[in-house]
Every structure is written in structure tokens, then in C-alpha cells.
Amino acid sequence: EYNGYKVYWEDGAQFTPPHDKGVTEEVMAITDLSTVKTMGAQEAKAKGLYEIIGAAIDDKYIAQVKAQVVNQGAIDRMQDQITIVYTPLHGTGNIPARRVMKELGFTHVYVVPQQELPDGDFPTVSYPNPEAAEAFALGLKLAEEKNADLVLATDPDADRLGVYVKDSKTGEYHSLTGNMSGCLIGDYVIGQRKALYGLPEDGAFIRSIVSTNMADAIAKYYGIQLVEVLTGFKFIGQKILEFENTGKGTYLFGICLLYTSPSPRDSTSS
């Protein structure tokens, strides 16, 4: 069944105005499908217009995600003291998420076995959404068995991340909203960068119009500008590209996008 598609621009983010308008106009101008030029897969491959993403691209992606780590030393010191439970919720996040955690040095990572492999029927959940508490039922059960500190869940197409953290005093697990985790990651990334390298005078923290105003307070605390954009990671990507093209502004963080690449929303990098 056709389920739509996403179109990305050369910066790696989904395209934004005016490019979206141009594509829409071209599509709407078609009055007879028989006039549309087509090309078979073999011809497209021969002309370098068709490429199946494989291991080489996977490796580049993983390398980019790992490059976003701001303090590997902190991970090295704590990797044996942190226990993580992870579930891909029958989706696509299993291999990349586990690979990144392993290569960064996290040794105590447990995957929910019932939800490890891809399954479009999602037999263990009625709604495979990491923002829903029900999706964490098996993950939290395993977390209690393993005395885990952190429970992570990615949605089926691995572009959203759900988080539960353990209260060290009570032993209870509490969920973090996207605004909570975004601010925690943002404060950590910017704070670490300040401590290690200092912050640029034109540093910017980006949030969408629906994200928490706590981001404003974080930006004020670090003395950097707060930039507000429309809802959607593509608009964060658009602002990043604007910074790069104009030389006015240095991207530090966006809720919740760590660095300039990869630009789409992505649970593995988070």
C-alpha cells in the first residue's frame, strides 16, 4: 500500500519553501500521465541516478553520529556504571542504535527480546509510539529485572525517542517528555562545549514555536541567541543552512537536533 514519501534537499533536511512550491507546481502541471518520462532501474543505475543505500552509507552515518559526542572521556569513565534497556518497538532502530551504543563503549545494554526484530503487525503493543506509556511496558519490566538506569525506545521508523529514567532514591522510573530530554541534552551539549572550547559570540540555540520556553532560559544563561522557527526539523535544517551560507550565526543546538548532520529528526543521534 502506498504510504507517501519524503523529499530531502542537498543539506540533508526535508525541503522547505520555495523548493516545495516548485516541486508541487511541476506535479500539478501534469495533465496526462502518459506524457511523463520514465526510466527503468537498470538504465537509472547505469546513468548514476539510482543508488541503493547499503553498508557504506550506514558506516558514514554511524561515524557522523559518533562524531557528535562532545565528551567521550565522560562516557569512558561511566560506561561500566550505566545499565541501559532499549527497545526498537518492532521497528528499524535495532541495528543502528545498538551499534552506536556499543561502539561508544556502553557495555551493559539489554534489548527487549519480544520487540527486537522488525514486525509490521506490532504484536506486543497496540500503538508503537514511544511517547505512550503502554509502549514501555515490556521495557520497564526488563529494566526492573536488570536494575537499569535508563530505558530507551525508538518508534518504528526510528525518528523519535522515548526515555524513562530511574530515580536513584525511590527506584521508580519516570518518563521524560520531548521538551525535558531536549533541554537536558541541549544544556549538556552547550555546557560541555563551553567548558572544553568556549562558545562563539554568534552561537545560536534553535527551537520551534511549539517547544518549551525553557530553551529561552538556557540560551540566556549561556549568553547565546535564541532562534525560533516553525514546527518541523526541516526548518531547523533551513536555519542551519542559512547560518552556513551567510556566515551569520553558529549553530550550537536545536530541540532536538544535535549538530548539522544528519539534519532530519533522528532517534539514534539523540
Language-model segments: what does each one mean?
Residues 86, 102, 139-154, 162-166:
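Accessory "access/gating" subregions that flank catalytic or transport cores
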Residues 3-135, 142-143:
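Gly/Ser/Thr-enriched, mixed-charge loops and adjacent short helices
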Residues 2-9, 159-178:
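Short Gly/Thr/Asp-enriched flexible loops that form oxyanion-binding sites at enzyme active sites
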